[in-house]
Amino acid sequence: MPSAGLCSCWGGRVLPLLLAYVCYLLLGATIFQLLERQAEAQSRDQFQLEKLRFLENYTCLDQWAMEQFVQVIMEAWVKGVNPKGNSTNPSNWDFGSSFFFAGTVVTTIGYGNLAPSTEAGQVFCVFYALLGIPLNVIFLNHLGTGLRAHLAAIERWEDRPRRSQVLQVLGLALFLTLGTLVILIFPPMVFSHVEGWSFSEGFYFAFITLSTIGFGDYVVGTDPSKHYISVYRSLAAIWILLGLAWLALILPLGPLLLHRCCQLWLLSLRQGCGAKAAPGRRPRRGSTAARGVQVTPQDFPISKKGLGS
């Protein structure tokens, strides 16, 4: 009966997955609370202490005026104005910054440090995202498919000798390593140099960006004390698009590479067992020891499907 099948589905698959999902969220909440709550309390106490010291040094101000000034600073920050800057700082809405913002909209990163403040800008952002997000998905699909075409040679496994399979695994690992260096290692080094961050902060920004989490605590090109080249944020937006396509390519290839390494390991074990069972004899052409592990294209649907399917 349908109700029995529904209960079986919930009991067999959905319920364990739901429990694992909730437990993972609870674990993350607990660890984040332990790591960050004390630092937040220290920062809050330090801020209150600095306000009291400021009022002691400037007795012409009272607590109410101070709170009003802090409120003005917060409103300016929400609207994308850095309180450390002045009127001579570059605009947050010049073409390069606007291009960077458009990229964060269609990629759904949404740092949160900058957003439209006018009603017309907010309405346009809604319709721009409605069209831009599907367009971004289609673009990344086709870009990832083009990148995947370069892996066609190392994704054909049928009737290949063992030495060729080893070379294919090494080639795939080299491809992933070089791509990771170009996308996830070198850009954080550049960001660290330009922004004055540590490498760990640059890598954190790169991962948070390319995973489309986009907290907004680290954003390139926003420090008013630095002089950036005019195309700096535009180049960062292009890096984001290429990085998203790269991650969409390698995320399915990670399990694939692990699976192929396991296949090679099983192949070595079977050939070793075959050699011990019949020393001095070559295995028959159709035997299991001669064939090793049979791998068909159906085992790797990634080579025949488009990105994101």
UniProtKB/Swiss-Prot annotation:
Induction: Down-regulated when pancreatic islets are exposed to a cytokine mixture of TNF, IL1B and IFNG. K(+) 3 binds at G110, Y111, G214, F215. It catalyses: K(+)(in) = K(+)(out); Rb(+)(in) = Rb(+)(out); Cs(+)(in) = Cs(+)(out). K(+) 1 binds at T108, I109, T212, I213. Residues 212-217 are annotated as: Selectivity filter 2. The channel conductance is stimulated by extracellular alkaline pH. Inhibited by Ba(2+) ions, quinine, quinidine, chloroform and halothane. GO terms for molecular function: identical protein binding; metal ion binding; outward rectifier potassium channel activity; potassium channel activity; potassium ion leak channel activity; protein heterodimerization activity. Highly expressed in pancreas, in both endocrine (alpha, beta, gamma, delta, and epsilon) and exocrine (acinar and ductal) cells. Expressed in pacreatic beta-cells (at protein level). Expressed in pacreatic delta-cells (at protein level). Not detectable in the other tissues tested. This is Potassium channel subfamily K member 16. It comes from Homo sapiens. The gene is KCNK16.
